[in-house]
Amino acid sequence: MSRYRGPKLKISRRLGTLPGLTTKKSNKLNRPGKDGNTDIGKKLTEYGVRLEEKQKLKFNYGLTEKQLFRYVKEARRRQGVTGLILLQLLEMRLDTLCFTLGFAKSLAQARQLVNHGHITINKKVVSIPSFQCRLNDIISIKEKSSSKTLVETNIKNNQVREIPTHLRFDTVKLEAIVLDYCDRNDVSLQLDELLVIEHYSRR
């Protein structure tokens, strides 16, 4: 199953605010559907609620179904709180960290920066958006990168958003170091990750 490339506002109207998908807000208050009234009087089943939480995670991080299931399996395999571990795995992706640091306005743009070879880890170019960063990794913009101006502009526009404490960012060098794994409070996406784990419990 391929990654979603359709209208982003339609998804955010249906699922709520998804900071990784888009920062734009729709003028339409109702969920998508005929006259915006398809959900009136309807109550989601337990399965429907779990599915919706899964969809939030999938669309926010720009994942395919196969990718998300793989992250869930890896989170189950590790010791600790499975839901938090799942979020930590997603937040330690290189594209997610670039977005969190303000290098890009969305995860899709962050993914492009990585794909085009503009991001380095420990001074080496890494062009894989799903690359799992580790503690003490140093993330920076490639020297003489054509995207440096774009990144600088995005950082200025993103100054409202605080850099989480598990990252340390040098705005002069455009360089960050991963100090720790994120806490639940560091994840801006509003969802119940336990329901996502439950959704995949029979697989």
Curated annotation (Swiss-Prot):
SMART domains (alphabetical): Ribosomal_S4, S4
Gene3D superfamilies in alphabetical order: Ribosomal Protein S4 Delta 41, Chain A, domain 1 (1.10.1050.10), RNA-binding S4 domain (3.10.290.10)
Family annotation (CDD domains): S4
Intracellular or extracellular location(s): Plastid, Chloroplast
Keyword list, A-Z: Chloroplast, Plastid, Ribonucleoprotein, Ribosomal protein, RNA-binding, rRNA-binding
Function in brief: One of the primary rRNA binding proteins, it binds directly to 16S rRNA where it nucleates assembly of the body of the 30S subunit. With S5 and S12 plays an important role in translational accuracy.
Main location (coarse class): plastid
SUPFAM superfamilies named in the record: Alpha-L RNA-binding motif
Entry superkingdom: Eukaryota
GO-annotated cellular components: chloroplast; small ribosomal subunit
Pfam families, A to Z: Ribosomal_S4, S4
Protein name per its UniProtKB record: Small ribosomal subunit protein uS4c
Family designation: Belongs to the universal ribosomal protein uS4 family.
Occurrences of domain S4 RNA-binding (ranges): 92-164
GO MF annotations, alphabetized: rRNA binding; structural constituent of ribosome
Annotated segments matching region Disordered: 17-39
SUBUNIT field: Part of the 30S ribosomal subunit. Contacts protein S5. The interaction surface between S4 and S5 is involved in control of translational fidelity.
PROSITE patterns: RIBOSOMAL_S4, S4
Gene Ontology terms: biological process: ribosomal small subunit biogenesis; translation
